[in-house]
Structure formats: structure tokens, C-alpha cells
């Protein structure tokens, strides 16, 4: 059972707390950061296990190279920075030194998407899903809330191979009652709300907004199935095949190459007779502003999502 709780808590905090838990469980787990540990929350691990924490400085490419080297010695490696730098600046090193040899490196990137806020376009990474899912051997995940993040981090620690996880800067609304409810399995989507008229597939911090949109649609006599798609690669093709004839994707990411692109590929490759509406960042750069204002500006808040869906349904 999921619901909009009205309680907000940072996924980054869930990440930091879970790193400490995993550090106690796995003596071969190490954590790297690129001089942003206070923001990424890896500082929690550094305080608890200083001998297993390495600050690479503002040198993300070097950090990934260090992570790859440590992984070859049997370490479980977590490497973190802001998503713009962890995925963008370090992309070639990730491709050639981590993904190509399929090393056990987990790149956990924070401050993803438009809701970075006042930092503006230079820090608003809305292309990371696209560039990371294009890399062979790479798993790409966007957790939903604080509790869900904890289970995502636990799961990828046990998975042997490269993983990219993105999470936002802001505190996001909790939709799960506890960790037990916030189940996660790599490559599996999850139906959160049953519906008959359309399917909304959302990922990351947009899942609560999709739930909010679903409530507004219900008030207007429209029954929406809501699907949480935490793993964008490998994507759950079966849940897409079983979706309604009208599919809407929602993401805090470019509609090019992100969740919308991934769902479009499944629909096209399988010859599915489904209408697709992609809601996300429409091939533009971000701008400075408060997170909530930016969500509304780019049409990514629940009210705007519902309005866009109703407008689209009137065309049918």
C-alpha cells in the first residue's frame, strides 16, 4: 500500500545511512567521493570507517579510475559525486575502465535532474539516464523515496557488476510506510495503483508526482494505473506490454533517451498498438529557481501532469 504521506526526507540521507550498515556487513566495501561527501552524504561512512573512505578531490575521472582499480582487488566499490560530474565528466572512464571489464563499481550520483534548483543549467543533469543506459553492462536505477533508496543500495551491494544510481538533491515525499513495503528488484517495475483508462509509468522523484496526478485524474472520472519503474536498464518489458493502450511516462530527465525513450523502444520493438505521451524535459537546458517552482515551470508537478494527460485524452 502506497500513499502520499506529506512527509519529506532525502534519498541522500537514506544512502548515507545504508552505507554505514553495509560497511559493518562487508569488510571489503569501500567508498570514494570527489570532494562532495557532505552533499552526497558519504561523509557518514567516512566518519564511521575512515580507513575505507577515499576523497579523490575535484577529479571525478581519477575517482572512477581509482574505483576500477580497487574493484580488481575484490572490493565492493561505491563512488559518488553530483550526477553532472559523476556521469558526464567521467563518462569515458566509466565506459572503458568500469563497464567494459564489468567491474564491481556502484556509481551513486546525487543532485540529478531539474530540481537541483538555484545552481542552474550547469548542474542540472537531465541527460544522465540516456548516456549511462547506452553503456553495455551498465544497470541504471532511480529510487523513489527515502525507504526505497535503502533497499536499492542494499540490493546493488549484492549485485556483482557496474551500476549507476541517480537521486535528487531535494527531500522527496515518502510514499512507502516502511522499508519492508519499499521492495525493490533489479529489472522489475511495480504497479502501485490499479487503473483502467491509462498507464502512467514514472521513475525516481516523479513517482509521488504521478500518484498526485492520479488522484486528480480520479476526481475527474479518469482511472489511471500507476507504475513505478525504478530500473530503467534493464527495463521491465513485460509490465510495459501489459500496460493500457494509452501510456504516459513521467521523469525529471530529458524525454530523449530517458525513461520515455526506453518505453518507446519497447513499444516499437514489440509492435505494440499503444499511444505514448512522454512527459519530462523537452530537449532544453534547465534554469535557476526553487525546486517546486521548476517542477511547475517544466510541467512535472502532479497538477501539471494531470492537466497534460486530460488535454491529450480530449484529442482522442
UniProtKB/Swiss-Prot annotation:
Annotated InterPro entries: PDH/Transketolase, THDP-binding, Transketo_C/PFOR_II, Transketolase-like_Pyr-bd, Transketolase_BS, Transketolase_C
Cofactor(s) the record lists: thiamine diphosphate
Annotated EC: 2.2.1.1
GO MF terms held by the record: transketolase activity
PROSITE patterns the record matches: TRANSKETOLASE_2
Pfam families (alphabetical): Transket_pyr (PF02779), Transketolase_C (PF02780)
Cofactor, free-text remark: Binds 1 thiamine pyrophosphate per subunit.
Gene Ontology biological-process entries: organic acid metabolic process; sulfur compound biosynthetic process
Reaction catalyzed: D-sedoheptulose 7-phosphate + D-glyceraldehyde 3-phosphate = aldehydo-D-ribose 5-phosphate + D-xylulose 5-phosphate
Keywords: Thiamine pyrophosphate, Transferase
Signal peptide: none
Protein family (similarity comment): Belongs to the transketolase family.
Name of the protein in its database record: Putative transketolase C-terminal section
